[in-house]
Structure formats: C-alpha cells, structure tokens
Amino acid sequence: MGETLDRQLGLLRSQLVYRAIPWRGAQLRRFYRRFVPAGGLAFDVGAHLGNRVAAFRQLGARVVALEPQPDFVRQLQRRFGGDPGVTLLPQALGRAPGRARLMVSPRTPTVTTLSGDFIERAGASPSFKGVSWQAGPQVDVATLDGLIARHGQPDFVKIDVEGFELEVLMGASRPLPALSFEFLPAMRDVALACIDRLEALAGPGHYRYAVSMGEQLQLLRPQGEPADALREWLHALPHDGPSGDVHAWGPGAGSGTRR
C-alpha cells in the first residue's frame, strides 16, 4: 500500500513538473530546433513522460524513445502508442547488451538509475536530501550501436540516465552527429569522462560543446567551445552546484538542417 502510494505520488510529481507549464512545449521546440531537423531522427534515452518526444515530433522528426520504468512506459504508450513516427522501447542503454537491475526512487522517479555509484555519491549531496532508492525490476539493456543498426543514424541523441551517461556512450563505436548528456557537479568526473569518450570517438576538436543549466533551455555559449574550455568550466563548479546538460555537435550539425 505504502509503495503504491509513493509511486502514485512520484508519477503525479513528474506530471506537475513536466506538463503543468503551458508554454514549455514551445520553449522545447525553440531550444531543440537547431539540433533536430524536420525529417530527421532523434533518440530520446530516458524519455520519462515524453515531453522531449513530443517536441521532437512537433519539429517533424521521427523518434526512438527508450524508457525502462514500467509506470512511465505505460504513460508513453498512452500518449504516443498511436503515432507511427514514435518507436517506444521499454529498455535501457549501456556498454553491452544484457539485463540490469533498476534502482528506483518511487517518490522521485526522475532519479531512478542503473548506477550504484550515482546512488552512493549523488545521494550524499545536500540537494538529494530525503531521496531514497530501492531495488526495482530487471530491465533489458541495449547499446547505441545496436539501436543505430536497427533504426538508423540519429541526427540527435538526448541522454538522461542519472549517472549512467558514460556507460551509454561506451556502447557507441562511432561519432554521433549531435547529442546531449546530463551532468551533476557532485559527479563531474563522469561528465569529464564523457567528453573524453566523445573526443576519442570523433578525434580531438571535432565537437563543439555548450551547457544548459537545469530546465532553463538556454545554452550558456550558443556558439559552442572546445573540449578543454568545457573541462575547465566543469572543474570550477561548486560541489553542490546545479545540474544541467552538456550539448555536443560536430561539423554540419546544430544548424537545424539535415546532414
């Protein structure tokens, strides 16, 4: 009974956060227009309630949406199940195919994760005070390479996986045109390792990088900067500073047109 109530409260909380602002959809479309071209393909890794999925579809792209949490898979199926332009996959991504145990946070489902390191380190941060996790279901895990082989090369990949970002990128063997991944100052080493992975995949200097903070949907340096500048910026963040997303794009991407 208590666990069911916690899950219902968590779902309601997510709905209030992601759907209660009537103009948020327009903000999302404006923000992602440069990365998601009409007629393109976007992967939403960690789709949650699908606010990014909806924005990508409204921009005219096909979407492959991955979400391993059963409650949110059901919500996504209700919302997008009849849309032939959306492929819903109830699974996670990692460095190798297989199965893994979700660690769920019923009252704060946005921080459900596959990363035990995330629970230990982020959970000790003051901003996570009161957040708790428990063992959830076993879920299927695929790779970016497998996803690309099945669905095609994406124009943009959004990665929101609570400390598992590097594991997702380790499942790719070739550069992605454009992508974003979440960072947390308490775990900045994961973000730094993600940058190293991208630079290794594409070669030094291939990507430009820019950060957006929280849900502000605004790049701090829209023109982007090289990897070393972003590394320096991440190192300077206070330990309990706000989270955000790193955006990276290569030549020909980030212009709002198909490659």
Predicted regions and their residues:
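Phosphate/nucleotide-binding beta-alpha loop and adjacent structural elements of enzyme active sites
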Residues: 1-259
